[in-house]
């Protein structure tokens, strides 16, 4: 079996979930499972968190997959339906749909079945949702729909709740607080960062995404600073070790030049596994025997290279790419990206090992 694998720690997942429930109070947290639970395995996460009151996914395909697992927990579609006929599936499977534009509102008007819906408001993200110029008309149309359309509440999304300066997030919250809602409508505003940074935005429901998987929702630090534990650890092995003299080159296009006499390791990791060819720059670390070493040269389809300098390790030595001992956030920053991209990028051929079951 190929050495590259991701290890999913269910004990860490349960720990994070317990923390989220406590930090979300008085709200109830939704579990965000989009993109295969941020690469952690939607099936595994959903079955482990069997006390969750709500799941949130991007699209109807993800929601149907949950139902096929026998999971009957309420599910909300964060992008709503893409076609009018998907409302029939929402009714059949008992999904909640988000409504973020007038096209979707028209589909609801024409729908003869029964469905639960949430109204999405663009409070300043300027991505999805009814804008401030549209919101009055959106509410008027929502209130005019027959009782078969069961409005659950209103949702928005913060653009900058993960930053030190919360000015924009607070402006968005003030925008939402000006809305006059029916008494039974619920409010779902806070994402992972806002669960920590904006307790005044908790209201009825929060949405726990990246923090559920043990990673910091902020632009700095790592999850451990907030009591979180990484759920995913990705490891591989050294396949070969070569000694290079100073200025000797290695890899495609002679992409690496040895800065001095030393050792170069080849590891089982490539863009065929989902590891982007552009990630290695000499700044991205891996962890071997507790020491950090840089990825160098060009990532190939199945292999990458690590400069060991004067150190030497045997073939078969474990290499941690990110996770329990090498923070995913640190690797992401070095790669010029965010942790979400690292956990979601890995391809199906990467073996998965579940621990803590």
Curated annotation (Swiss-Prot):
SUPFAM superfamilies: Alanine racemase C-terminal domain-like (SSF50621), PLP-binding barrel (SSF51419). Keywords: Isomerase, Pyridoxal phosphate. Its cofactor is pyridoxal 5'-phosphate. Its EC number is 5.1.1.1. Pfam families: Ala_racemase_C, Ala_racemase_N. It comes from the Bacteria. GO terms for cellular component: cytosol. Substrate binds at residues 127, 301. Belongs to the alanine racemase family. Catalyzes the interconversion of L-alanine and D-alanine. May also act on other amino acids. NCBIfam families: alr. This is Alanine racemase. It comes from Dichelobacter nodosus (strain VCS1703A).
């Amino acid at each position: 079996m190929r050495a590259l694998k991701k290890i999913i720690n269910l004990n860490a997942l349960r720990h994070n979930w317990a923390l989220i429930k406590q930090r979300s109070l008085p709200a109830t947290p939704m579990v965000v499972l989009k993109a295969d639970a941020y690469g952690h395995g939607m099936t595994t996460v959903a079955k482990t968190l069997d006390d969750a009151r709500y799941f949130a996914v991007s699209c109807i395909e993800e929601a149907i997959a949950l139902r096929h697992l026998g999971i009957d927990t309420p599910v909300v579609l964060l992008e709503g339906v893409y076609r009018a006929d998907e409302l029939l599936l929402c009714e059949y499977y008992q999904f909640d749909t988000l409504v973020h534009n007038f096209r979707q509102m028209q589909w609801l008007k024409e729908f003869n079945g029964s469905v639960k819906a949430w109204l999405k408001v663009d409070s300043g993200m300027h991505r999805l949702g009814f804008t401030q110029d549209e919101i009055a008309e959106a509410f008027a149309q929502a209130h005019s729909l027959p009782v078969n359309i069961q409005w659950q509440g209103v949702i928005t999304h913060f653009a900058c709740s993960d930053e030190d300066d919360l000015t924009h997030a607070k402006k968005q919250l003030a925008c939402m607080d000006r809305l006059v809602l029916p008494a039974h409508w619920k409010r779902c505003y806070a994402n992972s960062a806002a669960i920590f940074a904006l307790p005044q935005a908790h209201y009825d429901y929060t949405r726990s995404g990246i923090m559920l998987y043990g990673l910091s929702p902020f632009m700095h630090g790592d999850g451990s600073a907030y009591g979180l534990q990484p759920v995913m650890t990705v490891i591989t092995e050294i396949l070969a070790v070569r000694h290079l003299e100073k200025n000797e080159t290695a890899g495609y296009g002679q992409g690496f030049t040895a800065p001095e006499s030393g050792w170069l390791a080849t590891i089982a990791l490539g863009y065929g596994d989902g590891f982007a060819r552009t990630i290695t720059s000499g700044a991205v670390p891996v962890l071997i025997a507790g020491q950090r070493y840089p990825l160098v040269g060009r990532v190939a389809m199945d292999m990458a290279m690590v400069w060991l300098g004067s150190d030497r390790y045997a073939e078969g030595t474990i290499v941690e790419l990110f996770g329990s001992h090498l923070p995913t956030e640190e690797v992401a920053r070095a790669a010029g990206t965010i942790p979400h991209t690292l956990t979601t990028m890995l391809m199906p051929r990467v073996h998965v090992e579940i621990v803590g079951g």
